């Protein structure tokens, strides 16, 4: 059992616009395709000018590898630092972040640590947060109230110095979906008795078990999960030595890592260098956005009724903020983004790492629509 140290309070400068009632995590907001800016106007998603040259896309600075991200009902965000276990409250008005607590006992070797977060679908009643993290023994999922004790929900997920996965999301069915990695041993992804290289479906009210929880298999490193407007589950797969993938995730299907066959499911998108290193995904209406660590950009395209890419793959924020990790759309259609420039690979700026909130993300555009 992991203990938690309560450390923080609240911001004096941010007033929530309640009352709020949390709803199960479900379809994303519908965001209209961006319009071309008028002459002299700023393009959507580009850094806007702030007071005395400040960048109003940036809502938090001075963080350390923020990877977990969950949006609270009051419009603020919980941000989890991969290599410290700190959970911060970040405010959309760029008030100073507040340190709320620390998850101890992390193993941050390689890409391990605090890797993903999700709010309980009944957060207004139980105040629970779920986290995917690496310990000395395994990767596991825990649940806790802010300032409380972390209790294991699902343990025994294989760990490694690389490819630890960490994606978490609640589906419209109330189940918790978790993306795992192959831990650097690709053959494990095809082993139906091993939890590595899989997407898991976990009944948080039942008795979670081992292989019975496998939803999909044949993945390298599932770094992000996101939902379409109809509740369809999508995931990103970070792959060494091959294009990264965006997949439509279908129960009991195999996704071809490390060896594709006639029965494996093809990705809907493949991202080659230099735009690869996928870290996050989000859907708005008929369009999908995926962030890139190595590529230092956000890719976006429109999907058709069969979830195939129907428009040109475009990009924004290219090299503007460095390595981009987690994505979430809030109720106002703004896109929250975390940077990972202090992960030992990036070249951090003095104010890294940062959390961004893009008010008019250019997600959408040409291509076929979904009926």
Task: Map each language-model feature to its residues.
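C-terminal amphipathic alpha-helical segment
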Residues: 242-245, 266-283
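Sec-dependent N-terminal signal peptides
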Residues: 1-2
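Acidic, Gly/Ser/Thr-rich repeat motifs that build Ca2+-stabilized beta-propeller blades
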Residues: 11-184, 232-238, 275-306, 313-317, ...
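Repeat-solenoid scaffold signature
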Residues: 214-241
């Amino acid at each position: 059992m992991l203990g938690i140290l309560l450390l923080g309070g609240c911001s004096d400068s941010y007033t929530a616009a309640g009352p709020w009632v949390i709803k199960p995590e479900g379809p994303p907001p519908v965001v209209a395709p961006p319009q071309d800016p008028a002459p002299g106007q700023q393009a959507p998603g580009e850094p806007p000018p702030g007071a005395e040259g400040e960048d109003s896309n940036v809502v938090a600075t001075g963080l350390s590898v923020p990877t977990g991200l969950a949006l609270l009902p009051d419009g603020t965000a919980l941000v989890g630092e991969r290599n410290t276990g700190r959970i911060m409250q970040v405010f959309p008005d760029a008030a100073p972040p507040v340190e709320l607590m620390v998850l101890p006992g992390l193993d941050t070797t390689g890409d391990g640590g605090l890797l993903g977060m999700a709010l309980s679908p009944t957060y207004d009643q139980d105040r629970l947060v779920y986290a995917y993290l690496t310990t000395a023994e395994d990767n596991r999922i825990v649940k806790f109230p802010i300032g409380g004790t972390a209790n294991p929900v699902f343990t025994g997920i294989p760990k490694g110095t690389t490819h630890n996965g960490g994606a978490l999301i609640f589906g419209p069915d109330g189940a918790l979906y978790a993306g795992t990695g192959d831990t650097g041993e690709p053959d494990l992804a095809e082993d139906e008795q091993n939890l590595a290289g899989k997407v898991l479906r976990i009944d948080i009210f039942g008795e979670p078990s081992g292989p019975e929880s496998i939803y999909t298999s044949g993945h390298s490193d599932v770094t992000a999960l996101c939902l379409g407007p109809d509740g369809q589950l999508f995931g990103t797969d970070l792959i060494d030595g091959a294009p990264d993938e965006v997949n439509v995730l279908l129960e009991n299907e195999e996704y071809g890592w490390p060896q594709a066959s006639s029965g494996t499911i093809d990705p809907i998108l493949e991202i080659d260098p230099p735009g690869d290193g996928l870290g996050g995904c989000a859907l708005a209406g008929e369009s999908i956005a995926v962030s890139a660590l190595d590529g230092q950009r956000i890719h976006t395209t429109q999907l058709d009724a069969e979830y195939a890419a129907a428009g040109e793959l475009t990009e924004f924020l290219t090299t503007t903020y460095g390595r981009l990790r987690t994505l979430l759309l809030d109720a106002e259609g703004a896109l929250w983004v975390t940077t990972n420039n202090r992960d030992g690979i990036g070249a951090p700026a003095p104010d890294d790492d940062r959390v961004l909130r893009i008010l008019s993300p250019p997600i959408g555009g040409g291509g076929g629509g979904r009926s």
